[in-house]
Amino acid sequence: MIKWPWKVQESAHQTALPWQEALSIPLLTCLTEQEQSKLVALAERFLQQKRLVPLQGFELNSLRSCRIALLFCLPVLKLGLEWLDGFHEVLIYPAPFVVDDEWEDDVGLVHNQRIVQSGQSWQQGPIVLNWLDIQDSFDASGFNLIIHEVAHKLDTRNGDRASGVPFISLREVAGWEHDLHAAMNNIQEEIELVGENAASIDAYAASDPAECFAVLSEYFFSAPELFAPRFPSLWQRFCQFYQQDPLQRLHHANDTDSFSATNVH
């Protein structure tokens, strides 16, 4: 039985949050006990600092809140919670939502249309999510809405807008941009060959550098076995930035499971 440090610190009148149940989602089971303990500590602080706002009748309970907080904190497990400064609210719809989108064409005409969004991240504003896609983020499939939007927040710490280059040292920027654009070109080539639906990486990654960083951050944490062998140089840059190696973590967890299985009598 794990001795969770947050339970020791709870005052007697507080109701214990269901952290152990919240950690049971497939994405988090590969973490070591030490990593899980640190992640929960960050998630507790996240819930103290941020306001989760349910919209359109969505019901937010303690388990859902804990799982949302854990996913927010996974990318900053080693970076620290201060990397999530700059927003105070997380707005949560029950399902994908409709927004007004304004864009300018090549001749300067401004167009307005209503589009369906899964999530949004504003540089100096809230993160907007929907519960259906949050639930789909619990497994290790390569899709993770929360990590995607967190990546955008981390990206904008480097400047006024998301560029696909997070806050790294200047001497590393050129190499990062080179490897990121090489990945985008590779993904685009696959799309042209097999089509968007058959591509092994979400086609959205080829749309622009900011989306490539966000999409590949999803794969970094939830499908490292797809990311690492395909883009090894960029993988190493992600490992250095996030200060984590999810592929090594996955291999260690699999080895542990195999060892346990062979020792069952």
UniProtKB/Swiss-Prot annotation:
<comment type="similarity">
    <text>Belongs to the MtfA family.</text>
</comment>
<keyword id="KW-0482">Metalloprotease</keyword>
<protein>
    <recommendedName>
        <fullName>Mlc titration factor A</fullName>
        <ecNumber>3.4.11.-</ecNumber>
    </recommendedName>
</protein>
<dbReference type="GO" id="GO:0008237">
    <property type="term" value="F:metallopeptidase activity"/>
</dbReference>
<dbReference type="InterPro" id="IPR010384">
    <property type="entry name" value="MtfA_fam"/>
</dbReference>
<dbReference type="InterPro" id="IPR057256">
    <property type="entry name" value="MtfA_enterob"/>
</dbReference>
<dbReference type="GO" id="GO:0005829">
    <property type="term" value="C:cytosol"/>
</dbReference>
<comment type="subunit">
    <text>Interacts with Mlc.</text>
</comment>
<dbReference type="GO" id="GO:0004177">
    <property type="term" value="F:aminopeptidase activity"/>
</dbReference>
<keyword id="KW-0378">Hydrolase</keyword>
<dbReference type="InterPro" id="IPR024079">
    <property type="entry name" value="MetalloPept_cat_dom_sf"/>
</dbReference>
<comment type="function">
    <text>Involved in the modulation of the activity of the glucose-phosphotransferase system (glucose-PTS). Interacts with the transcriptional repressor Mlc, preventing its interaction with DNA and leading to the modulation of expression of genes regulated by Mlc, including ptsG, which encodes the PTS system glucose-specific EIICB component.</text>
</comment>
<feature type="binding site">
    <location>
        <position position="148"/>
    </location>
    <ligand>
        <name>Zn(2+)</name>
    </ligand>
</feature>
<feature type="binding site">
    <location>
        <position position="152"/>
    </location>
    <ligand>
        <name>Zn(2+)</name>
    </ligand>
</feature>
<dbReference type="InterPro" id="IPR042252">
    <property type="entry name" value="MtfA_N"/>
</dbReference>
<keyword id="KW-0031">Aminopeptidase</keyword>
<dbReference type="GO" id="GO:0008270">
    <property type="term" value="F:zinc ion binding"/>
</dbReference>
<keyword id="KW-0862">Zinc</keyword>
<keyword id="KW-0479">Metal-binding</keyword>
<dbReference type="GO" id="GO:0006508">
    <property type="term" value="P:proteolysis"/>
</dbReference>
<feature type="binding site">
    <location>
        <position position="211"/>
    </location>
    <ligand>
        <name>Zn(2+)</name>
    </ligand>
</feature>
<comment type="function">
    <text>Shows zinc-dependent metallopeptidase activity.</text>
</comment>
<feature type="binding site">
    <location>
        <position position="111"/>
    </location>
    <ligand>
        <name>Zn(2+)</name>
    </ligand>
</feature>
<keyword id="KW-0645">Protease</keyword>
<keyword id="KW-0963">Cytoplasm</keyword>
<dbReference type="Pfam" id="PF06167">
    <property type="entry name" value="Peptidase_M90"/>
</dbReference>
